[in-house]
Amino acid sequence: MKQVLTFITFLIFSTSIHAKDSTIFTPVSDLILAVSNFDHAKMRAVVDDSFLLLEHGEVWTIDDFVNVVKPADYIRTNYFSVINSRVEGDVAFINYWNKANIKNTERSIDIYWLESVVVSKVGDKWLLSQMHSTRLPQDEIPKGVTFIKQQI
């Protein structure tokens, strides 16, 4: 009986951590899905007014980011692997791997990024304040990382 209670307590504790982590990760997931769908309004809706993207050696505002996201003839499927996260009051810090499979009629490629974000709670929702993204070289695949497909 003690083992059953310990197991149930573990499940409840694990679920609450997972729920909290998924809530703070929502703006990240929503932003990447908006990029995949070329949805500029949604991209803007998940960031705060001071948002900056540090993208592979460049500093971008949300306007810069939106301007490079143009409709194209491909399907993008996203995958994530959260390394860790920490919440301090109304600010959260998340480190994660990001994988995109880009597929068109001619080919399919995987692209990998190592990313970190700062999200801030504004009212009752989390918004992206800062994102740092480093793209891995084309043939470099992160070792020992298990990716989870983004739920749409």
Model-based region annotation:
Residues 85-92, 119-127:
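A short, structured loop/turn motif at beta-sheet edges
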Residues 122, 130-152:
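Low-complexity, intrinsically disordered terminal/linker segments enriched in charged
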Residues 47, 57-58, 96-100, 115-117, ...:
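A mature extracytoplasmic/lumenal domain signature
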Residues 1-4:
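Positively charged n-region of N-terminal signal peptides that target proteins for export
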Residues 31, 42-43, 51, 65, ...:
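Hydrophobic pocket/interface hotspot
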Residues 44-81:
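Short solvent-exposed beta->alpha transition segments
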Residues 8-45, 86-87, 147-152:
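Short, low-complexity N-terminal intrinsically disordered segments enriched in polar/charged residues
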Residues 67-109:
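Surface-exposed, charged secondary-structure patches
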